[in-house]
Swiss-Prot record:
One of its GO terms (biological process) is galactitol transmembrane transport. This is PTS system galactitol-specific EIIC component. GO terms for cellular component: plasma membrane; transmembrane transporter complex. The gene is gatC. It comes from Escherichia coli (strain K12). The modification N-formylmethionine is found at residue 1. The phosphoenolpyruvate-dependent sugar phosphotransferase system (PTS), a major carbohydrate active transport system, catalyzes the phosphorylation of incoming sugar substrates concomitant with their translocation across the cell membrane. The enzyme II complex composed of GatA, GatB and GatC is involved in galactitol transport. 84% of isolated protein was N-formylated. Keywords: Cell inner membrane, Cell membrane, Formylation, Galactitol metabolism, Membrane, Phosphotransferase system, Sugar transport, Transmembrane, Transmembrane helix, Transport. Forms a complex with one each of subunit of GatA, GatB and 2 subunits of GatC. Its main location: membrane.
Length: 451
């Protein structure tokens, strides 16, 4: 009975499931029934809008990416199925239905022990933690190790939500919100490491250009819509399209630049009253401690700098795929949401697209290399879910290329010791620096409050 109920809820998808969770959560916080319904509906509408814009990108840029690969005769055999392909496979895994209550219990335990301020209401994105557990289960054959993977991943991302809370608030202007999920959060530590290194390099540390700088310098020709149009022209030309195809693609990428920030607005309209109510109720009950509502990283995609970086990294990621030694993955399914990978980097670099380019190249290189290493397990996951054609192989950049997932696999089932040492050293250094950076911000805020 429990499994049937959970399966039905999961099949509703995030555009229905998240509003339901939000309505229930809002009611628990003491909001009026009408306000709860309105907030949940606005959030659902916003995510439908995001889905439509992402669908537009996937339908237009996806074929262009494949055409680019064929045009340049790229020898990449395994197609990235992206999160739209990976998430259903994950929910069909043996540990999926148990992973949801486990991840929720981890969150509750961390809140009660004051180890996190993040109150996660984004149940759908627990699939990221579940993916880690599912691959660990396949790699080791141990159900308990798979569950341990869910627990470790969950605890880690809730802390990431805490550590990047200042960036979420100050750069993205999301008051009372945390973004603990997906590539945006777990790629953030790499950006922190890159930013610290750049700060130490004389001359390079002074280079700065942002979406706002481009707009100021070029006027109407530097506006986001125009930048989107130009990026569409470049992608279309690289894909070998004719004039008609190039222009059609350019208008669609321009539309993405205009529409993405606008479809975020209904979500913010729904979240604002909930965040205020949550802060006041939870702080009153738990002695003034500030709490954050954990939500989907899609909220970050509406920022102009993130959209600009996304369009830059669509063709750039295909180039990176060619250059990464041993890579077998052709970027495809996740290209439309490439902004997830660099969104937190944009905030860490304070909108500096030069630094975002550097950290983004490193992030995507690591992602593709890890995605290649997990092809075997990912293919097995797809086969178990009945989502694999005979003789086929699958990969994904989102989660399939996750450092936390791959490092845990190597801990419990070592296969590539040199890679484990190198990736582990880079990632753990980034995590340490992220923790230290967050502590520094807290100390600064305490000094300001004291003054």
């Amino acid at each position: 009975m429990f499994s049937e109920v959970m399966r039905y809820i999961l099949d509703l998808g995030p555009t229905v499931m998240l509003p339901i969770v939000i309505i229930i959560f809002s009611k628990i916080l003491g909001m009026k029934a009408g306000d709860c319904f309105k907030a949940g509906l606005h959030i659902g509408i916003g995510f439908v809008g995001i889905g439509l814009v992402i669908g537009l990108m996937l339908d237009s840029i996806g074929p262009a990416a494949k055409a680019m690969a064929e045009n340049f005769d790229l020898n990449l055999h395994v197609v990235d199925v992206g999160w739209p392909g990976s998430s259903p496979m994950t929910w069909a895994s043996q540990i999926a239905l148990v992973a949801i209550p486990i991840a929720i219990l981890v969150n509750v335990a961390m809140l009660l022990t004051r180890m996190t301020r993040v109150v996660n209401v984004d149940i759908w994105n627990i699939w990221h933690m579940t993916f880690t557990g599912a691959l660990l289960h396949l790699a080791t054959g141990s159900w308990m190790i798979g569950m341990a993977g869910v627990v470790i991943h969950a605890a880690f991302v809730y802390k990431l939500g805490d550590w990047f809370a200042r960036d979420t608030r100050n750069f993205f202007e999301l008051e009372g919100i945390a973004i603990p999920h997906g590539t945006s959060a777990y790629m953030g530590p790499i950006a922190v490491l890159v930013d610290a290194i750049i700060e130490k390099i004389p001359g390079v540390n002074r280079i700065k250009f942002s979406a706002d700088d481009i707009q100021r310098k070029f006027g109407p020709f530097g506006e986001p819509v125009t930048v989107g149009f130009v990026m569409g022209l470049i992608i279309g030309i690289l894909a070998g399209y004719d004039v008609k195809g190039v222009l059609q693609l350019a208008v669609k990428t321009a539309a993405v630049m205009l529409l993405m920030p606008r479809v975020i607005k209904p979500i913010m309209d729904g979240l604002t009253p909930i965040a205020k109510q949550a802060r006041s109720r939870l702080q009153a009950k738990f002695g003034g401690q500030e709490f954050l509502i954990g939500l989907d990283p899609a909220l970050l995609l509406g920022h102009t700098a993130v959209v600009s970086a996304s369009l830059i990294f669509i063709p750039l990621t295909i180039l990176i795929a060619v250059c990464v030694p041993g890579n077998q993955v052709l970027p495809f399914g996740d290209l439309a949401t490439i902004g997830f990978f660099v969104a937190m980097a944009v905030a860490v670099h304070r909108g500096n697209l030069f630094r975002t380019l550097i950290s983004g190249v490193i992030i995507m290189s690591i992602t593709l290399w890890i995605a290649t290493q997990t092809i075997g397990l990912h293919t097995q996951l797809a086969a178990n879910a009945g989502a694999l054609k005979a003789g086929g192989m699958v990969a994904s950049m989102d989660q399939g290329g996750s450092p936390i997932t791959w490092l845990l696999i190597q801990v419990f089932s070592p296969q590539n010791i040199p890679g484990f040492i190198i990736i582990g050293a880079i990632y753990l250094t980034g995590i340490f620096m992220t923790w230290r950076r967050a502590r520094g911000f807290i100390k600064q805020e305490k000094v300001v409050l004291a003054e």
